[in-house]
Amino acid sequence: MNSRDSAASEITPEVLLRAYACGIFPMAESADDPSLFWVEPELRGVIPLDGFRVASRLARTVRSDAFTLTVNQAFKAVMDGCAAPQPGREDTWINRRIRELYGGLHAMGHCHSVECWQDGELVGGLYGVSLGRAFFGESMFHRARDASKVALVHLVARLIAGGFELLDTQYVTEHLKTFGAVEIPRRRYTVLLEKALTGPAANFARLPTDRPLAGAEALAIIAERG
């Protein structure tokens, strides 16, 4: 379903959460387009948490702790990084209204960022929405090789430790396929989403948020689940 919403100002963070619970999410045509439209893909991208794959070379990078990882320490800067053009991604769909809405979800504790630092500089990261035991990945960026990949590894470790059941990537790219992402039909996705929204909520802060998590620890958590 792609329905144009010409009155984006009527969407609130609360409305956004209800939309995620129904399996839909907003996008904009471009950063300069003030309007939003709702999206409900026929085929949905997910990464099974018990099937998350880390290539050997990336595992060595994660284990080396070449990057320092933090959580929810630079949410706005991560959104800025995701909205900026990158090689292979010259255009962005993150407009001002998207920034406002997800900033509101962050203030409510439903939107989180994972930051990747090198020598005190933010070089990569990602952000997404948590609801129940589901996490909806929104966007990621990198300014140094493997930075966003390392952020994803740490995110998955945090989701596993916190009791999450569903990692929704919305769409599947060749990049995400290397981590085990697959496409599933909307009907199957709806079943998984309903299950993830029933019962106790997961805890995104189950792992410490006040100190960096070692790469070896993140990999051990993932290996235990897999």
Swiss-Prot record:
It is found in: Cytoplasm. One of its GO terms (cellular component) is cytoplasm. GO terms for molecular function: leucyl-tRNA--protein transferase activity. One of its GO terms (biological process) is protein catabolic process. Its EC number is 2.3.2.6. Functions in the N-end rule pathway of protein degradation where it conjugates Leu, Phe and, less efficiently, Met from aminoacyl-tRNAs to the N-termini of proteins containing an N-terminal arginine or lysine. Belongs to the L/F-transferase family. This is Leucyl/phenylalanyl-tRNA--protein transferase.
